[in-house]
Amino acid sequence: MILSDRDLKYYLEKSWIKIQPLREDTIRENGVDLRVGNEIARFKKTDKIFDPDNPDPSFFQTEKGEEFIIQPYEHVLLTTEEYIELNNDVMAFVNLRSTFARLGLFIPPTIVDAGFKGQVTIEVVGSSFPVKLKRSTRFIHLIFARTLTPVEYPYQGKYQGQKGVTLPKFNSQISSFYYQHQSI
């Protein structure tokens, strides 16, 4: 079941969904808008090979600021201003607000799992021309859905509790939680 604005207000009142800071214009008809945070990570152009078994953070350049220029076809990681917490029976689909999609910006399909807590880090792919993003601009839209029952294993993954832009985490950094709960 997709949550409407009324449902969202009720879930927020009951603390089944938490969003900090929560502004008046955040809650929309069938979802919540989240804002551009104060940090991005740019993917560096290189011929060097990235090895997931031996991750090297030098492939990224992290920046803090009040505004960011996304260059043509550039890939960046962006964080939201808001910190969210989802109950064990609530998940969210992340979409780019249509105004930015109409500029040619793109984000891949992304899900926020039931039980997640943290700021959302999202990949953004640039348009065919530079686009300026300012901190606190409503940028992504979360559509919340309630699961029929609470999930058996709420999200406890490697990005739980993340604050700021979070670079990818691989094998040696992955919690064994997921593997402990797989059927054989």
UniProtKB/Swiss-Prot annotation:
Protein name per the record: dCTP deaminase
GO molecular-function terms, A-Z: dCTP deaminase activity; nucleotide binding
Pathway this chain belongs to: Pyrimidine metabolism; dUMP biosynthesis; dUMP from dCTP (dUTP route): step 1/2
InterPro entries for this protein: dCTP_deaminase, dUTPase-like_sf, dUTPase_trimeric
Organism annotation: Saccharolobus solfataricus (strain ATCC 35092 / DSM 1617 / JCM 11322 / P2)
Keywords of the record: Hydrolase, Nucleotide metabolism, Nucleotide-binding
Active-site positions on this chain: 123
E.C. no: 3.5.4.13
Enzyme class, spelled out: hydrolase
CDD domains recorded: trimeric_dUTPase
A Pfam cross-reference name: DCD
Catalytic activity: dCTP + H2O + H(+) = dUTP + NH4(+)
Membership in a protein family: Belongs to the dCTP deaminase family.
Subunit (UniProt): Homotrimer.
Stated role: Catalyzes the deamination of dCTP to dUTP.
